[in-house]
Amino acid sequence: MIESCFNVGIWATGLALLMNQGQSPLLSNVGLSVLAYKATAMFIPRVGPSFIKRGFSGKDMNKVEKYVIPETMGAVSALVYFMCMIIFIPVLFYKYLVPNHNPNLPSDGSVAEVAKSQFPHDLLGAYLSALLSILSVSLLGILDDLFDIRWRHKFFLPAIAAIPLLVVYYVDYGVTYVSVPSIVRPFLKRSLINLGFLYYFYMAAVAIFCPNSINIIAGVNGVEAGQSLVLALVIACNDLFYVLSPKNKDALRAHLLSLYLVLPLIGVTAGLLKYNWWPSRVFVGDTFCYFAGMVMAVVGILGHFSKTLMLFFIPQIFNFALSVPQLFGLVECPRHRLPKLNVKTGLLENSYTEFSLNEHPLPKKTLLTISIFEKLRLIRVEYDPSTGRPLRCTNFTIINFVLYHLGPMREDHLTICIMGLQLLTGIFGLIIRHFVAPLVYPEDNI
């Protein structure tokens, strides 16, 4: 009874915020995000059996009893997100669609004409291009879950999905310059450097990196949704710095748009994490990783903080750099690099890449790579005591890196460690952006 009343209260709060009397789009978006959380949490257990019947299912490899549970539940989160963002369109532009309620417009018969002339077509274009790019990458995720597309075939596809966004950015904003640090300006004799089309290549690279980087930190209950939730919260905090203390109109508008896109992501991710947390009752699938990563790339580009975004993605950058030897064939890469369950202790331990005993000797590139990474304490290598030949090494992932340094741990504790690391780097990024960067960059280029 108490739980039912609590749930009704959450639904009522979301609806009240959505239809707030002040017609504040931000408050309405907060309410919509609350409803997105409840809708995601409601739909997932109801559609799970249907997903299993259609073949969208899998077994949790890190459990003693490997039950079949529904997979690709990220598609439910993405669908709820898109429904919410479509519903939000008339809310965002309410004062232009219903001009009689806009106090800033004249009260005579010309109110409709004035409202039409003031309608922010550029904001609508940016909003719709963002949804189109996110939808395109979400479809890529669904296809990947269906057909298990190879990395070399899908790696660059998010850049194609970002084309609508980049075109709108080119037409409406066109900002391609970067600020030069004040200590370097006397030598370069300029405060700005115009990168031209190189800046668009950089933004395309951001669109490629964000979805893929979420996707390769995986294999543990809750880690994909958990890292995405922390990242989205940090991005929202970054936006609030500008919204609560606006320095200029352009910065306020850019970060409000970012908030409109990222708050519903927080809602649907929290709803998904409720069922993906250890012991997981659903798998998120590649769909969620691509969807969530693209939302973050989009808000970074439209919010003009794509460089700051990379500070928040430090764990993902570290994981990608650590994974390079296996991704590019310097060291053998197994099909799955997730940690292994010790059945006796119930704890997760490092997974290893085994080196074939029939291969004499190991390639020089492999020996050099594992030697360097071992000296940097990034991996553990086990050797044959009689010959000194490497027998196996831990897989090159941040999850195995954490297990290597902190030792075996329970699955949910490992996810908490990854989320904690994500939060610490997010706070570090906020400190760098809002307290250190102003000392180096006198002007804020939003």
Swiss-Prot record:
Membrane topology listed for this record: Multi-pass membrane protein
Cofactor or coenzyme needed: Mg(2+)
Residues annotated for UDP-N-acetyl-alpha-D-glucosamine binding in this entry: 59-61, 71, 221, 335-337
Cellular compartments per GO CC: endoplasmic reticulum; membrane; UDP-N-acetylglucosamine transferase complex
EC numbers: 2.7.8.15
InterPro entries listed in its UniProt record: Glycosyl_transferase_4 (IPR000715), GPT (IPR033895)
Transmembrane spans: 1-21, 25-45, 73-93, 123-143, 155-175, 191-211, 216-236, 254-274, 282-302, 311-331, 412-432
UniProt KW keywords: Endoplasmic reticulum, Glycoprotein, Glycosyltransferase, Magnesium, Membrane, Metal-binding, Transferase, Transmembrane, Transmembrane helix
Glycosites: 395
Catalysis: reaction(s): a di-trans,poly-cis-dolichyl phosphate + UDP-N-acetyl-alpha-D-glucosamine = an N-acetyl-alpha-D-glucosaminyl-diphospho-di-trans,poly-cis-dolichol + UMP
Enzyme class: transferase
Gene Ontology MF terms: glycosyltransferase activity; metal ion binding; UDP-N-acetylglucosamine-dolichyl-phosphate N-acetylglucosaminephosphotransferase activity
Biological processes per GO annotation: dolichol-linked oligosaccharide biosynthetic process
List of residues binding dolichyl phosphate: 154, 208-216
Family named by the database record: Belongs to the glycosyltransferase 4 family.
Protein name (record): UDP-N-acetylglucosamine--dolichyl-phosphate N-acetylglucosaminephosphotransferase
Organism: Schizosaccharomyces pombe (strain 972 / ATCC 24843)
Gene: gpt2
